[in-house]
């Protein structure tokens, strides 16, 4: 049993609370849904000749360093939290890794906020509410149907707006709601005497982590929706967003 941290909420392999079972089912269903979407896209999307490739420098070195550091911290936090919470492997080490990565995540989040306050990157997180519902419907339709038919993306990333409307809302929710809540609940788990709500905070912290896991799964899959599976990932290596214009007479290519 985990006697170091959250022992009263230790979950052995033969005991999972009902809410955690439901959460596991949700994660599994999401993964199945993403696999089905990928298979349908592969089978149904028409093969079109690519047009001329355009490159726009949209991701500064600071943003890319923050992104990769943040991604690494999320992975380490999820793994150390999983191993520590379920007493897999060296629990004491996992708790230490989780704690230090949590403080590092706090530093990275502060850095993210400062970047948005002091550079032009912040404009990409300012929502234009005029026609927002219509734009979200267009983007949802593209993900569900349009991409299967090889339709052009309804919102191309530009220097003025890097994100489509669904991306913008999702990133806002993650970076300005989920991450702060994860940090706050994590600190209250680390210092339970502050609020006296250790067990409650631990459950909430784990639930928020599962939401974060769902986001990561969706984010990684959506990053494969470029002209090639690795195209969008390359943008976080060299900073250039790439897209191809439709060849003349072909309105279906991206």
From Swiss-Prot:
Binding positions (a menaquinone): 219
GO terms for MF: electron transfer activity; heme binding; metal ion binding
Origin superkingdom: Bacteria
Compartment list: Cell inner membrane
Ribosomal protein recorded as keyword: no
Entry binding sites for heme b 1: 67, 219
Signal peptide coordinates: none
GO BP of this protein: respiratory electron transport chain
Topology in membrane: Multi-pass membrane protein
Transmembrane segments: 16-36, 71-91, 97-117, 169-189, 196-216
InterPro entries recorded: Cyt_b561_bac/Ni-Hgenase, Di-haem_cyt_TM, Hydrogenase_cytochrome
Any one GO cellular component localisation term in the record: plasma membrane
One Pfam entry name: Ni_hydr_CYTB
Keywords: Cell inner membrane, Cell membrane, Iron, Membrane, Metal-binding, Transmembrane, Transmembrane helix
Cofactor(s) annotated in UniProt: heme
UniProt binding sites for heme b 2: 98, 205
Subunit structure comment from the entry: Composed of three subunits: PhsA, PhsB and PhsC.
Protein family according to the UniProt entry: Belongs to the PhsC family.
Known function: Component of the PhsABC thiosulfate reductase that catalyzes the reduction of thiosulfate to sulfite and hydrogen sulfide, with menaquinol as the sole electron donor. Proton motive force (PMF) is required to drive transmembrane electron transfer within the reductase. The PhsC subunit anchors the complex to the membrane and contains the site for menaquinol oxidation.
Protein name as annotated: Thiosulfate reductase cytochrome B subunit PhsC
Gene: phsC
């Amino acid at each position: 049993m985990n006697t170091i941290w959250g022992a009263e909420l230790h979950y052995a392999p033969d005991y999972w609370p009902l809410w955690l079972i439901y959460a596991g089912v949700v994660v599994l269903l999401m993964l199945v849904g993403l696999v089905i979407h990928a298979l349908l896209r592969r089978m149904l999307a028409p093969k079109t000749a690519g047009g001329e490739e355009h490159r726009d420098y949209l991701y500064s070195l600071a943003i890319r360093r923050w992104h990769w550091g943040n991604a690494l911290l999320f992975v380490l936090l999820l793994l150390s939290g999983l191993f520590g919470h379920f007493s897999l492997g060296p629990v004491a080490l996992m708790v230490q890794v989780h704690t230090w990565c949590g403080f590092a995540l706090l530093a990275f989040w502060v850095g993210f906020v400062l970047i948005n306050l002091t550079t032009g990157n912040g404009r990409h997180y300012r929502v234009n509410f005029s026609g927002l519902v219509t734009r979200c419907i267009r983007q949802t339709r593209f993900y569900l149907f349009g991409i299967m038919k090889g339709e052009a993306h309804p919102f191309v990333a530009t220097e003025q707006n890097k994100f489509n409307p669904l991306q913008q809302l999702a990133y806002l929710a993650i970076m300005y709601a989920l991450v702060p809540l994860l940090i706050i609940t994590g600190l209250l788990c680390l210092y339970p005497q502050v609020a006296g709500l250790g067990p409650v905070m631990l459950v909430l912290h784990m639930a928020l982590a599962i939401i974060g896991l769902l986001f990561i799964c969706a984010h990684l899959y959506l990053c494969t929706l470029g002209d090639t599976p690795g195209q969008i990932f390359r943008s976080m290596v060299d900073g250039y967003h790439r897209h191809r214009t439709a060849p003349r007479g072909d309105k279906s290519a991206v």
